[in-house]
Amino acid sequence: MLPSLQSLTKKVLAKQCVPVDQYHVLKCCGLWWYDGPITFYVYRHKMFIRSTCFSEGIELNTVLMKAAKENNHDLIRLFAEWGADINYGLICAHTEHTRNLCRELGAKDRLDRDYILKIFFDTTRNKTDSNIILCHEMFSNNPNLKNVDNLDLREEIMWELRGLMEITYMLDHDNSFSNMLTKYWYAIAVDYGLKKAIHYFYQRYTHLHHWRLMCALFYNNVFDLHELYVIERVRMDIDEMMHIACVQDYSYAAIYYCFIMGANINQAMLVSIQNYNLGNMFFCIDLGANAFEEGKALAEQKENYLIADALSLKHYNPVISLLSVIMDPEKINCMLKNYHSINMRVFLDYERR
């Protein structure tokens, strides 16, 4: 769609740093939203909007969805003229009047399955607090997603969260599509350490406190783990927590945290072997695990002969510096951020001979 001279002028104005005493000009031009100015900028060839409700900046296509959900026709027209894909607006248009406007501006009569899936995952790509919260608001309980078989999105989300979903499936009996979407956004927030988004979900979804704890363990987020376990006092069986921490390799901070809280380190070693996680296995040995015979038998049973050979050596010892009790997540992160297993080095040196 060709932009009008008026919309081009607004675009130029939206790129400027306008002083507070001239905000009335922005209001008169329709560049005002949620009690703040609308700012336009380009970053890495993508167009972004910044306003009071999303100070980090949101992609123009995503902001169009919010305008459509709110039936804000002036902003729908403006964002479309600035270059937004009007089909994104159709996803969140819940009234016939707004749907008709989107079609007048060039939207398709009906979005097919593949296009909706593309919009869904393109929108999720920007991992910021504002964007993840907005994605949740735009897609959760969205009747327009019924055009996509829920199974399609379920499969995609299950694939994105495959390790986490596999170990937590039996712990959550609410398998509704809406609940799965919320868990998806929540998991992204914990994975990327998005504090505002994490607390947004924490305040609104009290039934998902354990899900947040599982995500913190799975994604090795020791800061969130500490906040939940010690400050918020969200509780799970400590060995169950250690099991989740061991599923992804090199989750040293989460494993260490569970260890100092009393989890069975030999059991952690076996879970690591079960999941073919060589890094986690050696870290457990660094922490004093000694289930060598049982671990070797398990590795041979799973035909993982590299691990079986590693466990045949008799030269491993606990790392004394790791055995002091540290609870501060900042200190744990600092200690383990660039940690290389001493016992793994023993094995690698032996292999090079």
Curated annotation (Swiss-Prot):
Entries under InterPro entries matching the protein: ASFV_MGF360
Top-rank taxon, per record: Viruses
GO aspect biological process, one term: symbiont-mediated suppression of host toll-like receptor signaling pathway
Keywords: Host-virus interaction, Inhibition of host innate immune response by virus, Inhibition of host IRF7 by virus, Inhibition of host RLR pathway by virus, Inhibition of host TBK1 by virus, Inhibition of host TLR pathway by virus, Viral immunoevasion
Assembly, per entry: Interacts with host TBK1 ad IRF7.
Recorded family membership: Belongs to the asfivirus MGF 360 family.
Function per UniProt: Plays a role in virus cell tropism, and may be required for efficient virus replication in macrophages. In addition, inhibits the phosphorylation of host TBK1 and IRF7 and thereby negatively regulates the host cGAS signaling pathway and antagonizes IFN-mediated antiviral activity.
Protein name per Swiss-Prot or TrEMBL: Protein MGF 360-11L
Organism name: African swine fever virus (isolate Tick/Malawi/Lil 20-1/1983)
